[in-house]
Amino acid sequence: ILMKLKNKLFVIFFLLVFTNTFASENFFDSAKNLYEKKEYEKSKFLSQRNLVFNPKDSKSYLYLAKIFKIEDNEKETEKNLNSTLLLEPDNEEAMYMIIDIELKRSNFSKVKELQADFEKICTSLCEKITSINERLKNFDTSNES
């Protein structure tokens, strides 16, 4: 009897873990699809819901940051980008978005620090380094005038 109970508990536990993992994956996939369809409010809701089940999902934080950027909510954008980078320090897209925020703030010492990190991790967004350098150069030129 004890063995049967043990087996049933194991099966129930396994199903709960599997269901939660599957559900959170579905939330993210659905959120990403909604984002791509420009249904940002629904995407935001599902991304946040996904984080309830999987609080260490850097992709959900990144998509929330993108949505908040579209909504011009810099505080939430930055908060979600920082969460993304905390969980996935080599996320190029999040790093570039943070650099962009710091450039807009004219925080050039921070940009140069982040740029050095970005250059170490870039694999697919390396062309953005030129853009960063141009923006820094434009600031230096306008400062000299």
List each model region and its residues.
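Canonical tetratricopeptide repeat
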Residues: Y63, M97, S131-R135
